[in-house]
Regions:
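Positively charged n-region of N-terminal signal peptides that target proteins for export
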Residues: 1-7
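A post-motif C-terminal structural segment
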Residues: 34-35, 44-49, 54-95, 142-459
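A glycine- and small-residue-enriched flexible loop/hinge segment at structural boundaries
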Residues: 85, 89-112
Length: 459
């Protein structure tokens, strides 16, 4: 009898031990989060992710960190329609993530009346004395970062956004578009004559303008502005001048983790979107890979700081990217030309800058050969030249002048595009850490706010 009871107790103990890992995972995801890190790949739909995954695995011989997060964490599919549109843009999409309410196009965290501010997750954590950060490779006054810390009726009012971000007291601000912090007399775009860099320094910010200055910056509030316009595409970036997104993310986490109350930070791969607007597949892939490195920095931080909710997603997909099969010479379904992608040295935008406003077909052929090792035909080069002359309008921001270049390069790169603007494609949402158990199934991007708010137990 005693032997039977002993064997039964051993069996029950063994069964209990089997469930400990599961209960541990449940406990981890149900704990209150001290920190929240959200990374947003602007314009990164499933095809942009897929192209980078293929390139990384087949050319670089390594997997994406996002793949690891997908496999070990939580995964959902995300939709993002807004109050007034099926297809969103970045201001509305970021505002929905930041506030949990459906937004209207181009307004930054404002109610549908265009006058009433809607409180953001960053404003809520600020009230709880958490540190805050915004990091992007686009402009720090661009729509995605702006939606978390500013309220304006139209996203184009970037001078007001810059002012509001500093008044908010965001502890870490890193990105481009320094022009909105400087008066016109100093080469900026501010019409009020104010120099916000000087004002930031007086308010206790360290101002950094290069990768080296960022590296040397002490712990404390920092305003890193690394380009008068957007930061460079990763494919064009000069490492000695501009930091990578991963380097900015690492510095941001070093600073923000000093807060005893925890922190909230949004880190954006902002130029994925711009490259996709231009149908520039090599630049898209390089910027997704740079974004993935920043995801890796965040994942490494989370391993050492498990009370951190990590979220990785996108605001929308851009341009209907597709990985087509037919090659120029055959009907075989060989897929994206990885060698052609690998040989591409600069962005389409930089190439167009080299050949100027009135290029000859010969000049276009020369620069494409130098930049991509691709020999355009005379007709293809003429198509690009004609389209450039016809559509280039320096007075207006548009993508049309690169459309013909992207079109003639499609059969060489074997990457297709449905448009040069946003789409309503569903997106990926990955997560790990406290509160991430709510990430599952099909979700609307307003629910990301709910996940973050619940994880931090905000009221």
């Amino acid at each position: 009898m005693k032997n039977r009871l002993f064997r039964l107790s051993i069996l029950l103990f063994a069964v209990a031990m089997l469930f400990l890992p599961l209960s541990g995972l449940a406990a981890q995801t149900q704990l209150q989060a001290k920190n929240v890190i959200i990374l947003i790949g602007d314009g990164m739909g499933p095809s942009q992710f897929g192209a980078a995954w293929i390139y990384s695995n087949r050319v670089l011989n390594k997997d994406l960190r996002m793949s690891e997060l997908m496999n070990k964490g939580r995964t959902a599919y995300l939709v993002n329609d807004t109050a007034d549109a099926i297809v969103t843009e970045s201001a509305a999409a970021a505002g929905q993530i930041a506030t949990g309410q459906r937004m209207t196009a181009r307004a930054l965290s404002m109610a549908a009346d265009g006058k009433t501010p809607v409180k953001t997750i960053m404003e809520m954590v600020k009230e709880k004395k958490l540190a805050t950060g915004l990091v992007t490779t686009s402009g720090i006054t661009d729509a995605t970062p702006a939606a978390f810390a500013a309220h304006v009726p139209h996203r184009s009012d970037e001078s007001s956004v810059a002012d509001q971000e500093l008044k908010f007291g965001v502890d870490v601000l890193m990105g481009g578009r320094k022009q909105f912090f400087l008066p016109e007399s100093a080469g900026g775009k501010r019409k009020d004559g104010r120099n916000l860099l000087e004002e930031a320094q007086k308010a206790g910010y360290t101002v950094a303008g290069t990768a080296e200055e960022l590296k040397a910056a002490p712990a404390g509030k920092i305003l890193g502005l690394f380009n008068m316009g957007n930061m460079s595409y990763e494919i064009d970036r000069a490492a000695t001048t501009e930091p990578s997104l991963a380097e900015m993310a690492d510095k941001a986490l070093q600073i923000l983790s000093k807060s005893k109350n925890g922190f909230f930070v949004m880190i954006e791969g902002g130029r994925i979107d711009h490259a996709a607007h231009r149908n520039d597949a090599p630049a898209v892939i390089r910027d997704v890979l740079a974004f993935d490195e920043a995801v890796g920095v965040a994942m490494n931080f989370v391993k050492k700081n498990p009370a951190t909710l990590l979220i990785v997603t996108a605001d929308h997909e851009t341009a209907g990217m597709s990985l087509i099969g037919h090659s120029k010479e055959s009907k075989e379904y060989v897929g994206m030309d990885l060698k052609a992608i690998e040989k591409s040295k600069v962005s389409f935008e930089l190439m167009a800058g080299k050949w100027g406003k009135k290029p000859t077909p010969e000049k276009i052929k020369e620069i494409v050969k130098q930049s991509m090792d691709i020999d355009l035909t005379d007709n293809e080069a003429q198509t690009v030249a004609d389209d450039t002359i016809k559509k280039l309008d320096p007075a207006n921001f548009n993508y049309d002048y690169l459309h013909s270049l992207a079109f003639v390069l499609r059969p060489y790169l074997r990457v297709g595009w449905g448009s040069q603007t946003h789409t309503a494609s569903p997106l990926y949402l990955f997560g790990s850490g406290p509160g991430s158990q709510k990430i599952h199934g099909l979700m609307h991007n307003t629910e990301i706010f709910t996940v973050m708010k619940a994880a931090l137990r905000l009221k």
